[in-house]
Amino acid sequence: MRKKLKWLSFLLGFIILLFLFKYQFSNNDSWKPWSLPLSGKIIYLDPGHGGPDGGAVGGKLLEKDVTLEVAFRVRDYLQEQGALVIMTRESDTDLAPEGTKGYSRRKAEDLRQRVKLINHSEAELYISIHLNAIPSQKWSGAQSFYYGKYAENEKVAKYIQDELRRNLENTTRKAKRIHGIYLMQNVTKPGALIEVGFLSNPSEATLLGKPKYQDKVASSIYKGILRYFTEKGDPPE
């Protein structure tokens, strides 16, 4: 009889414990602290150029290679916080259909395909990653650009620019509104284009070729995206 009572007590205790456990984890307030901040967010990353289109050049460094490396690092940071990340490319290739002849035609088709991929996705945000280059060597500094179609474009660009200034400590640039960029004009999702530095500036080109600096840039972009999704109110200028 004593054995039976002991068994019943154990069983009752187990049932109570199971009920409490189930209640604790089904309660929304209790579960919130365990949720990753970007859970359920779908983000499209667009590393510029690729394949026959090398983009800007700085010594032996090609824009297409740096944009891909930075994008991979941004992807990893975002995924760690629960985001679903899609990339327009994950290798050294363009997106022009097979058989497309001629450099200019391939480039035009590549851009159309990037727009199509992003627009046909369920992404809540896109980030296009590029590098700058101009004839003068004196200009430097990462900068985010946005198209004025959506208010959200300006918001995410400003958050990312604030993080670039804060973390890289080598630019005072501000997020800038821009026109005439095919991808930005035709994408129907909020987003921004980030020029992560100038390959035409020898000192900055050297930095952009280093994995440690690439990671610093990627971390800044990631932190800006995180703030865009989690902070309320107006972003800093």
From Swiss-Prot:
GO terms for cellular component: extracellular region. It holds the Pfam family Amidase_3. Its EC number is 3.5.1.28. One of its GO terms (molecular function) is N-acetylmuramoyl-L-alanine amidase activity. Its main location: secreted. Residues 43-226 form the MurNAc-LAA domain. One of its GO terms (biological process) is peptidoglycan catabolic process. Residues 1-27 form the signal peptide. It catalyses: Hydrolyzes the link between N-acetylmuramoyl residues and L-amino acid residues in certain cell-wall glycopeptides. Keywords: Cell wall biogenesis/degradation, Hydrolase, Secreted, Signal. Gene3D superfamilies: Zn-dependent exopeptidases. It is found in: Secreted. NCBIfam families: spore_cwlD. Cleaves the peptide side chain from the N-acetylmuramic acid residues in peptidoglycan. This is a step in the formation of muramic delta-lactam residues in spore cortex. Belongs to the N-acetylmuramoyl-L-alanine amidase 3 family. CwlD and PdaA are necessary and sufficient for muramic delta-lactam production in B.subtilis spore peptidoglycan. This is Germination-specific N-acetylmuramoyl-L-alanine amidase.
